[in-house]
Amino acid sequence: MDFTSLETTTFEEVVIALGSNVGNRMNNFKEALRLMKDYGISVTRHSCLYETEPVHVTDQPRFLNAAIRGVTKLKPHELLNVLKKIEKEMGREENGLRYGPRPLDLDILFYGKHKIISDKLIIPHERIWERPFVLAPLVDLLGTEDIDNDKIVAYWHSLSMHSGGIFQAWERLGGESLLGKDGIIQRVIPIGDHLWDFSKKTYVMGILNLTPDSFSDGGKFQSVDTAVSRVRSMISEGVDIIDIGAQSTRPMASRISSQEEIDRLIPVLKVVRGMAEMKGKLISVDTFNSEVALEAIRNGADILNDVSGGSLDENMHKVVADSDVPYMIMHMRGDPCTMQNKENLEYNEICKDVATELYERVREAELSGIPAWRIMIDPGIGFSKGIDHNLDIVMELPKIREEMAKKSIGLSHAPILIGPSRKRFLGDICGRPEASERDAATVACVTAGILKGANIIRVHNVRDNVDAARLCDAMMTKRFKNVD
């Protein structure tokens, strides 16, 4: 049946797959998303980002693949024409080699609850069910609860011809077991000029506080020389990421002006960015101030680490969306002065509540234009949490992912950071009132977190925690090999 005359006077929900293996693949995706918006396609969800081997024509570069959900008033064939126009604007040759190299490939996977068969267009896309590089990002756009609560998504599931819907179709191809296996498909995050796979190892983030009032090392590294010396020390100990902060976020910390924070941060950031020893290392900047974030990004920050997730500065999401840096979103209630107030410590189920509130922050960021493939999450150990809350989070990290997956499987795959380093709850448990005496407890805590699925650990003592991370990674690698 030909649906070329399908009338569309209201918005229809669509799913569009993206692929690229020529030129700057991430820029190709970024420009494609911008052009979709210009042509009347509003993106509502992003998948994770995947690097995949080419199929059919194998003598070509690896692809980046992703997918988006969006809404549009464009009719099916109007949408097809728009996507072809975008491909052409991005340099794709109209009569190029089939399955060959291309700067951009845009395919309509679903269009509302419509089946469409014409000479130019078949929806649902006829090869969805046989392609892991299509199904992986497609699954990301769904939630585990959608099939019961969303009629359009339930219809998409029905098209798979499997009782378990799209999820079962993905599992029949191998599902998550395909990731990292023989290089077929990798879930990656773009940082700078490289793609990072946070499932391969635990990344150690070393803390560099440029503040006079941080709870553990305030005042130690305020000069450029002492800060650089500290960075060199952390590099020698095996750090992966340097997290630089110029505004204290300890309980009851006073908020300084944007200019003061910039004046503390930028001189150090510039020097650290230029250090030869930083090759292969990343720089994260810890700030909840959008003006500071903008200057940090301009001066070489690779990651923006925001303890408020944008709740303390309404311009933060726009600053991050306009950049190319990943965004670390942490769970916190209130601000550093109010986060430990009684009303901010009341939870029904800590992991479920944290996941729900984190999801809300993440969705606000995504709808502001920050793709899911640039988002990382932090459950906020020590922020708006009591002792038992912190312990439950560390021991039940999979529960946070599970709760996130109910709303968005893609967002549930975001790298998780934990930051228990030297925090008061460790001292309360171990009888260590001095923060500097809590390193052994920190190692124990991050070890538990890594074994429960943490991807990044944020610590003061780099050497000991690098050892802990390496041992945990070795144990988990051995466990997975034994399972195979």
Curated annotation (Swiss-Prot):
The compartments listed are: Cytoplasm, Cytosol
Report where it is expressed, by tissue: Expressed exclusively in reproductive tissues.
Q: Which CDD domains match?
A: DHPS (cd00739), HPPK (cd00483)
Biological processes, Gene Ontology terms: folic acid biosynthetic process; response to oxidative stress; tetrahydrofolate biosynthetic process
Cross-referenced InterPro entries: DHP_synth-like (IPR045031), DHP_synth_dom (IPR006390), Dihydropteroate_synth-like_sf (IPR011005), Hppk (IPR000550), Hppk_sf (IPR035907), Pterin-binding_dom (IPR000489)
Q: Which domain of life is it from?
A: Eukaryota
The entry lists its GO molecular-function terms as:
2-amino-4-hydroxy-6-hydroxymethyldihydropteridine diphosphokinase activity; ATP binding; dihydropteroate synthase activity; kinase activity; metal ion binding
> What sequence ranges are listed for the domain Pterin-binding?
202-470
GO CC annotations on file: cytosol
Q: Which residues form a coiled coil?
A: none
Activity regulation description: Inhibited by sulfanilamide.
> Per the record, what phenotype accompanies loss of this gene's function?
No visible phenotype. Increased sensitivity to oxidative stress.
User: What pathway annotation does it carry?
Assistant: Cofactor biosynthesis; tetrahydrofolate biosynthesis; 2-amino-4-hydroxy-6-hydroxymethyl-7,8-dihydropteridine diphosphate from 7,8-dihydroneopterin triphosphate: step 4/4; Cofactor biosynthesis; tetrahydrofolate biosynthesis; 7,8-dihydrofolate from 2-amino-4-hydroxy-6-hydroxymethyl-7,8-dihydropteridine diphosphate and 4-aminobenzoate: step 1/2
Which Pfam families would you find in this protein's record? HPPK, Pterin_bind
Which residues are recorded as binding Mg(2+)? 209
Known function: Catalyzes the first two consecutive steps of tetrahydrofolate biosynthesis. Plays a role in seed stress response and survival.
State the similarity comment.
Answer: In the N-terminal section; belongs to the HPPK family. In the C-terminal section; belongs to the DHPS family.
What protein am I looking at? Folate synthesis bifunctional protein
